[in-house]
């Protein structure tokens, strides 16, 4: 290709296995004059289905060269800068659980998201996600990193429906103030499940009104710290079977709206930076492994939370002066970024049928 200066430049070469070598990592470019694309040139390669596509911008410069093979796309600008585009299809994810699903990190250390890649439905409005905060969090979360990685792997956009509530229990007993909770829970006697479904229905109406092409991707679930502190090895307020039963019940409830084939992608519970209820948290991680092994459509998205303590990446890393009771069970922003990226890897595999 020739760049804007008229220099002939090599942008890729095929290796023996047929995959390209490229010198930039960029998503598929939008074919729309609103994005500065005034001309489209397609050149059929010598070996179908290879295709090279070149775009000329409003100034007449050759801006983007794209190489396509078996529906996998690589593209780059002539100056090797990333060229972004709006997805043509979006995958909807319900965010549920407690505070680590909300996010308690440092928003300034959360990645930005290019316009058009992600939206959220919250507060009765469908709005772009350009970074944190997302939903009812006032701080950094896992979800900008999730959006970026999901788009990088699939070319699809995401729509988040934030419904997580800090300190919420899965079992009603675990949420009682007498047991350290705030009264909010995901059980059949609580209000959170109904609120989540109502928000989902409103979000779908907004997507329909906005002309979005969409599909439902599943539930992004991060919960367990509250109930772990009520297990027999902690305060002995609930049994391990109670937790399993409540999870099964919630999954069945959501299935009435989402259908039987929808997926859960779990972030496994981590530890406590102060060492409190360590055995209860260890038992919760074991319970989560048992649930994933035995329940169809439930996947682990991230198991790295437990190692954040040893790596010095709990919330105190970003907020060393905050109270211990705020920091102990929450992650640094790097931790949330890792959480979102890892969960997006699993979500993208499910979205493109590689589950």
Question: Where are the regions a protein language model picked out?
Answer:
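Right-handed beta-helix
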Residues: 50-51, 55-65
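Short, isolated positions in well-ordered beta-strands
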Residues: 9, 21, 48, 63, ...
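Short, low-complexity N-terminal tether/leader segments at secretion or assembly junctions of large
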Residues: 1-39, 54, 66-78
């Amino acid at each position: 290709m020739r760049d804007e200066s008229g220099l002939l430049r090599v942008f890729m070469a095929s290796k023996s296995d047929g995959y390209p070598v490229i010198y930039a990592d960029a998503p598929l470019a939008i074919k729309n004059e609103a994005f500065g694309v005034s001309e489209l040139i397609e050149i059929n390669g010598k070996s179908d289905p290879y295709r090279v596509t070149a775009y000329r911008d409003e100034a007449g410069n050759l801006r983007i060269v794209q190489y396509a093979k078996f529906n996998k796309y690589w593209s780059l600008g002539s100056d090797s800068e990333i060229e972004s585009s709006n997805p043509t299809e979006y995958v909807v994810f319900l965010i549920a659980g407690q505070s680590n699903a909300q996010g308690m990190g440092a928003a300034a250390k959360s990645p930005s998201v290019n316009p058009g890649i992600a939206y959220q439905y919250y507060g009765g409005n469908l709005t772009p996600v350009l970074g944190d905060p997302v939903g009812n969090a006032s701080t950094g979360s896992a979800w900008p990193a999730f959006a970026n990685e999901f788009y990088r792997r699939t070319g699809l956009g995401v729509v988040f429906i934030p419904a997580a509530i800090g300190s919420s229990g899965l079992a009603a007993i675990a949420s009682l103030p007498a047991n350290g909770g705030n009264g909010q829970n995901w059980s059949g006697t609580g209000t959170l499940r109904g609120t989540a479904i109502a928000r989902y229905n409103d979000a779908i109406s907004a997507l329909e009104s906005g002309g979005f092409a969409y599909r439902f991707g599943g539930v992004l679930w991060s919960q367990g710290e509250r109930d772990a502190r009520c297990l027999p090895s902690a305060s002995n307020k609930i049994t391990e079977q109670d937790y399993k039963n409540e999870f099964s019940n919630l999954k069945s409830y959501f299935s009435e709206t989402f259908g039987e084939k929808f997926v859960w992608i779990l972030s496994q519970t981590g530890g406590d930076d102060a060492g409190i209820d360590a055995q209860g948290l260890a038992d919760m991680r074991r319970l989560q492994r048992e649930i994933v092994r035995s329940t169809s459509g439930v996947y682990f998205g991230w198991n790295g939370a437990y190692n954040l303590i040893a790596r010095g990446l709990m919330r105190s890393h970003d907020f060393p002066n905050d109270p211990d009771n705020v920091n102990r069970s929450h992650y640094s922003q790097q931790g949330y970024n890792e959480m979102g990226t890892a969960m997006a890897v699993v979500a993208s595999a499910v979205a493109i049928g590689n589950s």
